[in-house]
Amino acid sequence: MSKESQLEALVAACHWIGAKGWAPATGGNMSLREDARWCWLSESGKDKGSLTTDDFLQVDIATNLAPSGRKPSAETGLHTLIYRLFPEANCVLHVHTVNATVLSRVEKSDALHLSGYEMQKSLAGQITHLDDVPVAIFDNDQDIDALAERIARHHRQFPLRYGFLLRGHGLTCWGSDVAVARRHLEGLEFLFECEMQRRLLERA
């Protein structure tokens, strides 16, 4: 699929995310890899439910700079980190869902462990509900460079897959193309909803 087609697919995914209420108040950011050097990242302060292809800025993966001079999203450094860590990643979605935001605060360990859910198989490479699927949780930080370094350091010891949570902030996930990243987002959000309900019912 051409870059233009993939960017149109990403815009459609952004509209879907906006309709779900998963990126409220202009929150969240989305990107698409162009090649080894460049990616296209949503511009800061834009409502994700009404983005167009013109709202994506070309960004240098190595430097985080946008040649246009326009301001890319605040978490640019996390998107470019993922593209550097995962050559197979071609789309990154960062959302602020209620489930991801709350679960990342309730879970006090450094990972949310998912097991026993059939929908784990929505994640690439997962073939059984019996596996333990850890989703790493990192403390939120306004210093994105420092946060990116912590994530990279963690990945060197405990390789990341699919996505990670920022505590009290949201979910960042990725995939080999827009469709896979979107499936990972939808699958993880479903699993987070199940986990929220399970914890609430167990406390009742």
Curated annotation (Swiss-Prot):
Kindly give the SUPFAM superfamilies that the UniProt entry links to this protein: AraD/HMP-PK domain-like
Q: Which InterPro entries does this entry report, sorted A to Z?
A: Aldolase_class_II_sugar_metab, Aldolase_II/adducin_N, Aldolase_II/adducin_N_sf, MethylthioRu-1-P_deHdtase_MtnB
Q: Which reaction does it catalyse?
A: 5-(methylsulfanyl)-D-ribulose 1-phosphate = 5-methylsulfanyl-2,3-dioxopentyl phosphate + H2O
Q: Which UniProt keywords apply?
A: Amino-acid biosynthesis, Lyase, Metal-binding, Methionine biosynthesis, Zinc
A Gene Ontology BP annotation from the UniProt entry: pentose catabolic process
Q: Name one GO cellular component term.
A: cytosol
What Gene Ontology terms describe what this protein does at the molecular function level?
Answer: aldehyde-lyase activity; methylthioribulose 1-phosphate dehydratase activity; zinc ion binding
Question: How does the cofactor bind to this protein, according to its record?
Answer: Binds 1 zinc ion per subunit.
Its EC number(s): 4.2.1.109
Binding positions (Zn(2+))? H94, H96
- Protein task: Catalyzes the dehydration of methylthioribulose-1-phosphate (MTRu-1-P) into 2,3-diketo-5-methylthiopentyl-1-phosphate (DK-MTP-1-P).
Classification via NCBIfam families:
PRK09220.1 (NF006672), salvage_mtnB (TIGR03328)
Name the PANTHER family on file: 3-OXO-TETRONATE 4-PHOSPHATE DECARBOXYLASE-RELATED, FUCULOSE PHOSPHATE ALDOLASE
From the Swiss-Prot or TrEMBL record, give the protein name: Methylthioribulose-1-phosphate dehydratase
